[in-house]
């Protein structure tokens, strides 16, 4: 059975790093890998969503840039020496708020795991997690999230930390993914 994995990207080095990490993590598994780019035309996404309509010049230009960026990412993956035929890459370009787009794709494509970078294209060196990564970790409750640190090596983890206050009840499905990843990596789980 193929896994459905979501890789949000803003075309930053950090998101590319997370894509490579995901490919390495699931190199022995058959996967549908959805590469998502959420576009807008201006830095203020509220103005962008209000002012952009399909067919408008602003919308079409932003969508074209997004689709071109996704095509470049897929080309970069295809040209890698360790290109894996077990992986099917599906690009998704959409106009939305990043968190809402991620939630929609998780639901529509039956996503089992989100793997993303910690910081986006305009990430500050003083910030550990970008705002999108933080929102996804906090707000996406029906799908596990792996956030790959900017300087993480492309080696798989030997230890997985599971932080808990013991007040939250976790579903078996949520814990199964962590156990599966621990098995893939031959890693210990520390609570």
Predicted regions: what they are:
Residues 54-68:
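A short acidic, glycine-rich active-site loop
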């Amino acid at each position: 059975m193929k896994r459905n994995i979501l890789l949000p990207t803003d075309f930053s080095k950090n998101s590319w790093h997370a894509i490579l990490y995901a490919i390495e993590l699931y190199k022995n598994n058959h996967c549908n890998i959805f590469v998502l780019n959420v576009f807008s035309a201006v830095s203020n996404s509220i103005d962008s969503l209000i002012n952009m309509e399909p067919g408008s010049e602003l919308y079409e230009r932003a969508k074209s840039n997004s689709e071109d960026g996704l095509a470049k990412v897929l080309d970069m993956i295809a040209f890698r020496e360790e290109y894996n035929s077990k992986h099917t890459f599906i690009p998704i370009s959409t106009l939305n708020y990043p968190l809402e787009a991620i939630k929609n794709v998780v639901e529509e494509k039956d996503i089992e795991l989100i793997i993303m970078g910690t910081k986006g294209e305009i990430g500050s060196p003083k910030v550990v997690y970008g705002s999108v990564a933080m929102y996804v970790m906090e707000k996406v409750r029906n799908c596990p999230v792996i956030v790959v640190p900017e300087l993480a090596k492309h080696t798989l983890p030997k230890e997985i930390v599971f932080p808990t206050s013991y007040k939250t009840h976790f579903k078996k499905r949520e814990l199964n993914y962590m156990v599966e990843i621990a098995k893939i990596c031959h890693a210990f789980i520390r609570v």
